[in-house]
Amino acid sequence: MADLHIDDFYRDVATIFLRLYAVFPRKTILYVEDICGPDQPDEFGLHHPRFQAGFSAMVWLAEEGYLNFQDTIRAEALDQVVLSQKAFLLLSSRSKLGLTEQADEDTVPPSVAEQSRTNINQLRHVLREGSSIRLQKYVAFMLAQDPIGGG
């Protein structure tokens, strides 16, 4: 039996990292619906389990030291959220896994080739590919890395 909730978790983590990296170092509001789509509450007004899982992924990343935030907005968003030093250094560092094609240093400037090897660019590429197996492998790899710089 496939663990679809784990596939969703890895996709949520990737999306959270990409959204927060795009605005770093500014603090922002991160809405669950921007991560996993709109909520579909039940007849009692309770959040859909998928929506709850998206919120839980955001909180888990904070508990594990990848995000800092000031407050929650109900169970729908994190307020004043920003990548932690640990997450920023992980995402901006050179990937040790190299799941994706590297830019050819003969055809592009060295700075562009080096940038293509960062974890954030590798993550963008893997997410665009749409393979949940490759995404799971890459996010799991990143989460297993020791913090850079004591972060």
Functional labels for PLM-detected ranges:
Residues 20-24, 61, 90-94:
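Generic structural signal for hydrophobic core residues of well-folded globular domains
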Residues 79-115:
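Short, amphipathic alpha-helical interaction segments positioned at domain boundaries
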Residues 72-80:
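Short, Lys/Arg-rich nucleic-acid/phosphate-binding segment
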Residues 104-151:
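Short, cationic, amphipathic peptide segments
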Residues 2-45, 52:
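Short amphipathic alpha-helical interface segments
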Residues 45-64, 78:
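Short amphipathic alpha-helical interaction segments
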Residues 10-14, 55, 64, 81, ...:
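Non-catalytic, well-ordered alpha-helical scaffold segments
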